[in-house]
Amino acid sequence: MNPERSERIEIPVLPLRDVVVYPHMVIPLFVGREKSIRCLEAAMDHDKKIMLVAQKEASTDEPGINDLFSVGTVASILQMLKLPDATVKVLVEGLQRARISALSDNGDHFTAKAEYLTSPEIEEREQEVLVRTAINQFEGYIKLNKKIPPEVLTSLNSIDDAARLADTVAAHMPLKLSDKQSVLEMSDVDERLEYLMAMMESEIDLLQVEKRIRNRVKKQMEKSQREYYLNEQMKAIQKELGEMDDAPDENEALKRKIDAARMPKEAREKTEAELQKLKMMSPMSAEATVVRGYIDWMVQVPWNARSKVEKDLQKRRQTLDTDHFGLERVKDRILEYLAVQSRVSKIKGPILCLVGPPGVGKTSLGQSIAKATGRKYVRMALGGVRDEAEIRGHRRTYIGSMPGKLIQKMAKVGVKNPLFLLDEIDKMSSDMRGDPASALLEVLDPEQNIAFNDHYLEVDYDLSDVMFVATSNSMNIPAPLLDRMEVIRLSGYTEDEKLNIAKKHLLSKQIERNALKEHELIVDDSAIVGIIRYYTRERGVRSLERELSKLCRKAVKTLLMDKSVKHIEINADNLKDYLGVQRYDYGRADSENRVGQVTGLAWTEVGGDLLTIETACVPGKGKLTYTGSLGEVMQESIQAALTVVRARAEKLGINGDFYEKRDIHVHVPEGATPKDGPSAGIAMCTALVSCLTGNPVRADVAMTGEITLRGQVLPIGGLKEKLLAAHRGGIKTVLIPDENKRDLEEIPENVIADLDIHPVKRIEEVLALALQNAPYGMQVASVK
């Protein structure tokens, strides 16, 4: 039957690859070719109508007139969206078939003269029969083809028009491009439906064959599972009859490993029971993999292997001194342990906790202790650990379970008595998964760690031979955990210690790391001191090492760029040329005695520093003002000092009503830096007395100590850092609380020798030493 012709149209043509669009179809298209994009723009500028025509060959990038089919679909552009990659996404709806009578290419895009194709009318009853037959056949096709959703059949049942039904069925069938194009070119609905039903019949036959093959495979799998089940039953019967075959080679290998591990009785019985269980399992089962993994861990853990511990004290002392300068308390504690160990055959390993700021050598000291004692070294980083299972392990009921990191590290190191470094123990935290700090209580208790129980191993493991060393930046550690460790504080290095560390360790390491030779770079002691004072502000030596590395890099650059330079010498005079402008400064003693100005001593996180305190008295009504970012404790210290002065006003020659007629202003310079603490109490009191009496304060005197309302001087902390700051700043005389005399044992001898240190008990002694003209006429002896 020939199709009926209708009106002629002139319309832009969009070539499509591997896609045939039917009437009533709504489909998104991604357009990337420039010519096609211009075609869409032309359609959008006109009536949003476009003709969609499939290419004969999808591989053709630039199709010509002869590369397109003659029949396509006139469509309406519903939406057009330009994408960031310069392509266009367009949503189109097919309207009606059309045949091209003339196709032209104007350079921008294809334009076609076409005419709509209309289908001849068919009898209504005949159409109903065709629709019903097609739907029934398509329903059978959907049942076999699981790729088409059942909702499609629901939508087909609502279609009464035979032509639209045929197009919808064709759109959902996996037809070749040529077959889809053939359906598009059939304007006769009767012919179109018959063609599609024939294609569906062919597809149904193929799908039925595929289903039979799938059923055969399924039966084969069921047969394999049945055979596996029967094999397991057979093994059980053989076990009852005592007719088990010889164990496979793998089981024999595991048995030999168990014998070689020399496990304690409990661990051996547990491991052998698991091995017997493994023999009864299929090697390919998931449970066998779990059991095999458990046995592997049990034979890897060191149950009896030990490394020989060094007992020669002189040799061990030499090792510690070679690796680290200073740190005498730690070295003495290690040597004490070695001394006792040389006399006692069985001694529990000490549990030390090295507490100190970053960069003072806590972690490297752990390595040095291991080297000195002859133990193997193993480190476990605890920073950020928040799961108890990291310590105790996971129970084997969990998929992918493993022992805790403690047992893993012991298996890795291979001996029972290593030095185990617990790094950053203060950085642990807890959450809903448990508290790892609480799990460590058992590990670090010498009375309990003889029977440490890992959840994965499920047997006791002896940790009493392990030498645990923990490191921490602060004392912010749970009290029960802290109670189990011997805390050794590592304060910041002194200037002399930093100089020696730089000369003996850091500089040579950086010279080697930067491929320099010893004679090519000479760094004078004055340059190293300059770096310590003016380019770093720390209690450790990390920044110092970075600055030395910077010197080495600049030296390498200079040597390579200027061949005439054979070696480089760096001293205090040319240090600025290599490291730039000085970043820091340190407090220095004032050169003149001043009224109302006192030099105090402060402790900071990076060491000690000089603290200047200024006071001024002006006519007023007794207002007390304090500035300089002072904390609450320091403000209260000023008020206490003022009360002490008022109580002694008559003896000091101060008018008794000064607090009513004068305003007093106390200022501590460097106002942007917060300051707090009670240790500036005697300095505040001295400054107030000097201001009110006009008696200057000696510029070469610095002081530290808390004051009470009765005028007593109370002890303070951080004495070592404060005295080092006084020594560095050129102070000659230092006043300290009498109760801090015991702390002078920790001060370097060269610092003690250069300072005139006076322990004081009362404010009267402080004023007698600090003021230019002693108000009481008394003398106070120094500690020398």
Swiss-Prot record:
Localization in the cell: Cytoplasm
GO molecular function: ATP binding; ATP hydrolysis activity; ATP-dependent peptidase activity; sequence-specific DNA binding; serine-type endopeptidase activity
UniProt keyword Hydrolase present: yes
Enzymatic class: hydrolase
Keywords (A to Z) from UniProt: ATP-binding, Cytoplasm, Hydrolase, Nucleotide-binding, Protease, Serine protease, Stress response
Active site per the UniProt annotation: 679, 722
Domain of life, source organism: Bacteria
Domain Lon proteolytic: 592-773
CDD domains hit by this protein: RecA-like_Lon
Binding site for ATP: 356-363
NCBIfam families, A to Z: lon, PRK10787.1
Protein name (record): Lon protease
Source organism of the structure: Erwinia amylovora
